[in-house]
Regions:
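Conserved N-terminal helical subregion
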Residues: 2-5, 54-196
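Conserved FAD-binding catalytic core of PHBH/FMO-like flavoproteins
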Residues: 116, 130-134, 139-287, 291-297
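Beta1/beta-strand and adjacent pyrophosphate-binding region of the FAD-binding site
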Residues: 2-14
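Glycine-rich FAD pyrophosphate-binding loop
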Residues: 23-46
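C-terminal helical "tail/cap" subdomain of flavin- and related membrane-associated enzymes
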Residues: 2, 331-456
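Conserved mid-domain beta->alpha element of the FAD-binding
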Residues: 11-20, 24, 162, 197, ...
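Conserved Rossmann-like nucleotide-cofactor binding loop
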Residues: 14, 37, 167
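Conserved hydrophobic helix-helix packing surfaces used for dimerization/oligomerization
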Residues: 6-8, 29, 301
Length: 456
């Protein structure tokens, strides 16, 4: 057993996975969480946004050896089912390759599986209802308040890692040292928020919509999406602006909400008899992006996951990026060693920040794509060409596929290469390029891919 004690703040998805991997390496791990043990309490409605598990996240689960267990809790989604306003629904495949899909999984179910795995390690101690109030960064000390007793406790570790989410207390302690650390921080909210509703199963426990698709009802400045759950239900999420006649701040009566759905989503009403009650009972959540740098302080303290790089959910990569943090951190321990935490932390932040900044930007891009463009003629033609190319030439990957199905390619390269590919494809779709055969088109795209592979 190694002597170093690792204190991890935040027993969410990435924090618990990190604790497991550090315990596997023989470290003493103390894992602190401000909430109750979710295995012993009922989860509140309206905050559960389903997660999309893809290969980057699966590689993280492999570290804990629980990929098979989690996949049993997943429903594969092979593409988007688009429901235009007043038009016929149509399907857009995520990939032209056989078997590629993203997986709808419950955040709570996944977190519980990770907590159960963590509990099996004698060298992991878990403390719930402990809120971090502040940290002494250079000493690896964190101060906690017990939410039920009010007692305070000081905890010292050889290193201190914050996986405590977008409102990270550890990050706030780093911000208090802005001048010393040259700490840069930005937080940008969309003018939209989200609210969750639900589609319940049929009386027989079946699905009312195609279960193997992510459903989107795009309506210009707002949209609804729905993801399947194992029990036959769908988690339905409204993404709306706060302001404007159909904004969350202005639809304040049952009559207004009912009239709005009758106008924009009449086909959903039969599936959701309680939608008005859910609209008023469930909270409205904000959608924001957090970027910061550096992620480490004094070689004793490190940020990881949403604490370092919270993103909006529109690429389905928030959890996957955080699990990738854990994987890269473990790979660096293998290559660099753990004798020099400061050097390890520095290399980790250098490798990860450029990539998490990229997926943050891509997630914003995808918000506008899902809301405004999924039923646009040029976009639909581009997607048709992409999936046809992927079917015929499996070595070609669209921007979406580079991000989602190629964990060997960093997010930054996927973003730059994918944008360059999109530019070429959209030019072809709009007639800005001479007509090409499929093989000529593939050859040009592969030349482009080679340039990015070589770092050009």
């Amino acid at each position: 057993m190694k002597k170093d004690k690792i204190v991890i703040i935040g027993a969410g998805l990435s924090g618990t996975l990190l604790a497991i991997t550090m315990a596997q390496r023989g470290y003493q791990v103390a894992l602190y969480e401000k909430r109750d043990d979710m295995r012993k309490v009922t989860m509140s409605a309206g905050r559960s946004i389903n997660l999309a598990l893809s290969p980057r996240g699966m590689l993280g689960l492999d570290l804990a050896g629980i990929r098979p267990e989690i996949l049993e809790q997943c429903i594969p989604m092979r593409g988007r089912m688009i429901h235009p306003h007043g038009g016929s629904s149509f399907f857009q495949s995520y990939s032209g390759r056989e078997g590629e899909a993203i997986n709808s999984v419950s955040r709570g179910g996944l977190n519980i599986a990770l907590l159960n795995k963590a509990e099996s390690f004698p060298n992991i101690e878990m403390y719930f209802n402990h809120t971090c109030t502040h940290a002494v960064l250079e000493k690896g000390i964190a101060h906690f308040k017990h939410e039920k007793t009010g007692f305070t406790v000081e905890v010292k570790g050889d290193i201190l890692i914050g996986t405590d989410g977008s409102g990270s207390a550890l990050r706030k302690s780093m911000m208090d040292k802005t001048a010393d650390l040259l700490f840069n921080y930005s937080q940008n909210f969309l003018s939209h928020g989200y609210k969750e509703l639900s589609i319940q199963p049929t009386a027989e426990g079946g699905f009312k919509l195609d279960k193997n698709a992510l459903h989107i009802w795009p309506r210009g400045s707002f949209m609804i999406i729905a993801l399947p759950n194992m029990d036959g239900s769908f988690t339905v999420t409204m993404f709306h602006p706060y302001e404007g006649p159909y904004g969350f701040n202005h639809m304040n009566s049952r009559e207004e909400v009912a009239a709005f759905f009758q106008n924009f989503y009449p086909e959903l009403i039969p599936y959701m008899p309680d939608y008005v009650d859910e609209y008023f009972n469930n909270p409205t959540g904000n959608l924001g992006t957090v970027k910061c740098y550096p992620w480490q302080a004094y070689g004793k303290t490190l940020l990881m996951g949403d604490a370092a790089h919270a993103i909006v959910p529109f690429y389905g990569q928030g959890m996957n990026a955080s699990f990738e943090d854990v994987r890269v951190f473990n790979e660096l321990i293998d290559t660099i060693g753990d004798g020099d935490w400061a050097g390890l932390f520095n290399e980790f932040q250098k490798q990860r920040a450029v990539n998490t900044n990229a997926i943050a930007d891509l997630a914003i891009d995808n918000f506008y794509e899902m809301r405004d463009r999924v039923d646009d003629a040029d976009f639909m033609l581009k997607r048709k060409i992409e999936t046809d190319l992927e079917f015929t030439y499996p070595d070609y990957y669209s921007k979406y596929s580079l991000v989602t199905f190629r964990p060997d390619i960093p997010y930054s390269r996927a973003m730059h290469q994918g944008r360059a590919q999109d530019e070429l494809l959209l030019n072809w779709c709009k007639g800005g390029q001479p007509e090409l055969t499929k093989s000529e088109m593939h050859a040009q795209l592969m030349d482009l891919s080679k340039k990015f592979e070589n770092g050009n």
